[in-house]
Amino acid sequence: MAAPVVAIVGRPNVGKSTIFNRMAGERIAIVEDKPGVTRDRLYAPAEWLNYEFRMIDTGGIELGDEPFLAEIRAQVELAIDEADVIVMVASGREGVTAADEVVAKMLYKTDKPVILAVNKVDNPEMRQDIYDFYSLGLGDLFPVSGSHGLGLGDLLDAVVKHFPDEAAEQEDDGAIRFSIIGRPNVGKSSIVNAMLGEDRVIVSDIEGTTRDAIDSRFVTAEGDEFIMVDTAGMRKRGKVYENTEKYSVMRALKAIDNSNVILMVLDAEAGIREQDKHVAGFAHDAGRAMIIIVNKWDAIEKDGHTMKEFENLIRSEFKFLDYAPIMFVSAKTGQRLDRIPQLVKDVDDNHRKRISSSTLNDVIMDAIAVNPTPTDNGRRLRVYYATQVAIQPPTFVIFVNDVELMHFSYERFLENKIREAFDFTGTPIKLIVRARK
């Protein structure tokens, strides 16, 4: 199940980030702490009462010189588009302002649950002064103090009551779920539109069960069925926040959550940026199958070595994605786009691959015969046996006499031998070393 999304919106200086940080940092256990995105706290995975969810601090979307109203609109549009539950924050110290009314009116157009949190209610006496906020027309309100952590438990209890039922989630029914991610302007939308063009049969647009995203199902001439996740979001135009880097990262994280295979799009003209590596790292850490797509290849002056040189650059910059195949395409001319569905299917097959224990142990023992296990202070690592315990990604447990004797380099050696013996192109594999009891 994809984690529900909670967005925090409100006019400036009402304490949105304080509430966000308090909820994410103290009152809620952070499930995973990723560098970069959680550093600026735009998007934080979190948990409350055994519900896992993701929080968006829309205040992280900054539009620079854009007028105030446009910045507020960007926040609210982001919340309405992406969230399952919206928390509007106002300030109990200042009372209802015209800007609060602007935000509330924008939220009227959504049928998603909106919860009003009146912040800066730092003592019980202040509760008597907050009833004017009912005039915003958002129903029940929750007095809280972000700076003191007061009232957040009640607020979160109300939030999780609105989360969708796991039972309502769509079944994948054998279709391969994949997403196309990348920085703004690398050509994601062009690739999406080309792949959903006349040579594809659109079976249906599936309404997302936990948000308004549209997942597009299509079949190839070979009869393979795919679900391209959140194509509605990729194809939107004219949103004021569409080209902000933080929004791009946030959308990529959501796509990773909802997909089995990730197509990471790079721009051949612009080259590789830090954000490319940042987002790719999230997909790798999540254990998703990966394909690297280099778009705008038609715009590059080439000789007989250009493609190989660019591939070497990718391998150098994305050392952790050495398993990901690279495809050079042009959404403008259609070059090689017809090959993408088959490659997605191949890496998805590898992502789901199971290896019998007997075959796996033959490979492990052959590897040890070629390169004996390491020793430390006269003690030699002994590998007893290995077995596969999971797929998506393929995960193997290796039982040894002492975990401390398994050096990283030898673990990497065994992983490489497993990859040589079995085709795991496109998928990370996990090795877990355990001491045999």
Swiss-Prot record:
Binding-site positions, GTP 2: 182-189, 230-234, 295-298
Binding site for GTP 1: 10-17, 57-61, 119-122
PROSITE patterns: G_ENGA
A Pfam match: MMR_HSR1
Domain KH-like: 353-437
Top-rank taxon, per record: Bacteria
Gene Ontology MF term list: GTP binding; ribosome binding
Function, as annotated: GTPase that plays an essential role in the late steps of ribosome biogenesis.
HAMAP family: GTPase_Der
Family per similarity comment: Belongs to the TRAFAC class TrmE-Era-EngA-EngB-Septin-like GTPase superfamily. EngA (Der) GTPase family.
Full protein name: GTPase Der
Organism whose genome encodes this protein: Leuconostoc citreum (strain KM20)
